């Protein structure tokens, strides 16, 4: 089975270029104040558009959330100017995300800390992660706990990981499950997958295949490829459920179509065994075929969590 997911991994040089003409606003005599207000509004809009997090319940919902890997470098300028103009902790947090993206963790910490001092929950999650990287697990735990108690989904997820793994606190599987369940109730697929692995592996609680299947199924429905693979393995071996090779193949197919190489390999293996039709699936990841993938070539991956 795929192993349990780890905690969430969550930067300061001002970029010289920007996607908006921040300095191109024409200012007529006597209109400096109006121009300043226009500029402030423009940079706030750009910061929200370029760097709003999918895990921040306080983000500007007028714009689609942006994953940390997709943040444009110009967000650094926009968010710095937006924060300087308003002092709004949301812009400090989004500045931290933009700085994280360009690999400036020290300056990202300064931006996150400004938001943390203002009580911004999402910033506490990212600042906690960075404190953990510096070796201060107690501060990491405290920040996750504060974020979780404020209702932040990723804070709840990371707090579950902390209780499961004993990060900054004593391991407590009951509390780990409690916080994973809170995150899962808000739609977090990795939290649901983690609950499934806890019951599947039976190391922290009595092993329970039915509970594992139920939580894997929920995670798979939400698009978690690790859960798809684990369900496929359970169907293939008849672990806790009637063996069904075709259902196993279907779970592997779905995982492969969503980019999971192990799932793709298992589906191709099923094709070679004649369990499903042999023609190659054009939706499989590029380069994945039975001629290049052999048993042992693909290591079962571990979900590493999400950037916010």
Locate each region found by the language model.
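Structural signature of tandem alpha-helical TPR/SEL1-like repeats
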Residues: 69-77, 102-114, 133-146, 170-179, ...
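Bacterial N-terminal signal peptides
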Residues: 15-24
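N-terminal leader/linker segments that initiate helical-solenoid repeat arrays
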Residues: 29-84, 293, 300, 305
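Hydrophobic face of amphipathic alpha-helices that form TPR/SEL1-like repeat modules
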Residues: 94-101, 124-134, 156-165, 192-201, ...
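Canonical positions in the second alpha-helix
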Residues: 81-82, 114-115, 146-147, 182-183, ...
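Terminal, low-structured helical/coil segments at or just beyond the last alpha-helical repeat
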Residues: 44-46, 256-308
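N-terminal secretory signal peptides that target proteins for export/translocation
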Residues: 1-9
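Short helix-capping/linker turns of helical repeat alpha-solenoids
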Residues: 43, 85-88, 118-121, 135, ...
